[in-house]
Regions:
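Short, charged recognition helix plus adjacent turn
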Residues: 14, 34, 41, 61-72
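DNA major-groove recognition helix of helix-turn-helix/homeodomain DNA-binding modules
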Residues: 46-61
Length: 72
């Protein structure tokens, strides 16, 4: 499960909204919203990697967002 609250927070920190990030990913805005609302369960590894690069996330930030259920 993706920590979508942290993802949304990082988007805001980088001055990006859903529409801008979905455009940068080459994804339809509605599709991106659906993935956010499903706790990110439908994000592919490729999409997660692209998000990490677009938002310039550090390793710890990426782990906290995309691997939150595995990190104690």
């Amino acid at each position: 499960m993706v920590n979508t609250n942290k993802l949304r927070g990082k988007m805001i920190e980088h001055g990006m909204n859903v529409e801008e990030l979905s455009l940068a990913l080459g994804m339809n805005r509605a599709t991106f919203y659906r993935r956010l609302n499903s706790d990110g369960e439908e994000f592919s590894i490729r999409e997660a990697d692209m998000i990490v690069n677009i938002l310039k996330l550090k390793k710890e930030e990426a782990n906290a967002i995309f691997f939150s259920q595995f990190v104690a």
